[in-house]
Amino acid sequence: MSNMVTIRVSDFTTLPGARYKKDGDGSAEEFFDKYIKQHLEDRESILIDFDNTWGYASSFLSELALEISRQCKRGKLNVREKIKIKSNDEPGLTERFWGYIDESANINS
């Protein structure tokens, strides 16, 4: 089994916001590029810790899910085996995130 790496969104920003870098600081695109992508390429499992921020825009969550889904598909990785979610501050966020993953799987088909 591969190693598990923990990535805290709060280490990136406490104000996650936009979908794309061009839309401003704290974007999902930047978070994916700086924190997630390398670990998927290295085939490490990832625990994304969504705690200790001021909340999440749907644009941030949906873009992050889409990028993760795309990368997993390219690498022939099972996203549900590679990605684990921690969200004690907002328990419903886990369900929302997996919903976006499921939607993005349909988009990427």
PLM feature segments, named:
Residues 1-6:
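Small-residue-rich anion-binding loops in enzyme active sites
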Residues 8-44, 48-98:
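Amphipathic alpha-helical interaction surfaces in cytosolic regulatory modules
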Residues 96-109:
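The feature marks long, low-complexity, polar/acidic/proline-rich intrinsically disordered regions embedded
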